[in-house]
Regions:
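Extreme N-terminal leader/targeting segments of oxidoreductases
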Residues: 1-15, 33, 180, 193
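Glycine-rich FAD pyrophosphate-binding loop
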Residues: 33-54, 65
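Glycine-rich active-site loop/strand segments that organize a redox cofactor
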Residues: 60-93
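Rossmann-like flavin
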Residues: 80-121
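Glycine-rich loop(s) and the adjacent beta-strand/alpha-helix scaffold that form part
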Residues: 201-258
Length: 306
């Protein structure tokens, strides 16, 4: 519908979520189930997210009473962060991980089990022990599947999903004054019409900006839209270099190279340069190949370092 100013308005919602990856869909489903009216705005199909491309898994200690395991996870994270981590945030995320993983399981995510019936825990870079929940090497796709189905269950009641709609900009309550917050978002419909989506709360869950780099394992939608909208609205931006960065990929001339899961290093893969590999093949009979890896110069964990 159009208002007296000629703007085309969507129905007001309690929460507008921009993005349909694990963060956006999880929040949208939880809010809808609590009785809030929610709209998810996603510029491609709902499953087109970086979450869907993620392979390895999710780190967490499922038993909240395993204090030693939790503390080990905290130490590993702080060590991997090289002094850049906010310890309070690290402890909060790791402590709450068990609840969030159980929530995902409750939403239908099927993590792999071992022959004993427990979860098949893997090791990845930076971890000193096996604490990675995974679904084969397609964990992200499994999470996206489950959350998409959970969202579909809510679409007839409190949840609306706007696929192929592009969030253009945040609507500030007072233009030029970020302290007053936002009152909605302008969206571009598939037909090229700009609509106003009024909302009590707007959540930016738009993922990373991998496409700004020459090579990235992110999908083509990772263009930093949410960060740009937040910046234009006066929000403080920090730590951009750490968003959605994956360290290992198969080299090619393709601008989006094939992602190599961190789980390979957990299973013993060694990071080596071509020269190091050649030296080991020529002179390394009987020598542990990890001794030739450049990673021994940077981390006591060798190829598991981050």
């Amino acid at each position: 519908m159009s208002d007296q100013n000629g703007e085309v308005n969507l129905e007001q919602v309690d929460v507008a979520v921009i993005g349909s990856g694990i963060a956006g869909l999880f929040l949208a489903v939880e809010c809808a189930r609590s009785g809030l009216k929610v709209a998810v705005v996603t510029k491609k199909e709902v499953s087109m997210s970086s979450t869907n491309w993620a392979q390895g898994g999710i780190a967490g200690v499922l038993d909240p009473n395993d204090l030693e395991g939790l503390e080990s996870h905290v130490r590993d994270t702080l060590d991997a962060g090289s002094g850049l981590c906010d310890e309070e945030v690290v402890r909060s995320v790791i402590t709450e991980a068990s609840d969030r993983i159980r929530d995902l399981i409750g939403h239908g995510v099927q993590f792999d089990h071992n022959s004993s019936g427990g979860y098949d825990m893997a090791i990845e870079g930076g971890h000193s022990g096996a604490r990675i929940f995974h679904t084969r090497d397609r964990t992200g796709a499994e999470i996206e599947r489950a959350l998409t189905e959970a969202a579909s269950d809510e679409t007839d009641t409190n949840l609306t999903i706007l696929e192929n709609w592009m969030a253009v900009d945040l609507i500030q309550r007072v233009h030029g004054d970020p302290v007053q917050g936002v009152s909605g978002v302008w969206c571009l419909s598939p037909e090229g019409v700009v609509w106003t989506l009024p909302s009590r709360v707007v959540v930016l869950a738009t993922g990373g900006a991998g496409m700004m780099h020459k090579a990235t394992t992110n999908p083509s939608i990772a263009t930093g839209d949410g960060v740009a909208m937040a910046s234009r609205s006066g929000a403080d931006i920090r730590d951009m270099e750490f968003i959605q960065f994956h360290p290992t990929a198969l080299h090619s001339n393709n601008p989006r190279p094939f992602l190599i899961t961190e789980a390979l290093r957990g299973h013993g893969a060694i990071l080596m340069t071509i020269q190091e590999y050649s030296t080991w093949k020529t002179n390394g009979a009987g020598i542990d190949p990890s001794k030739h890896s450049f990673m021994v110069n940077y981390s006591p964990m060798g190829s598991l370092g981050t």
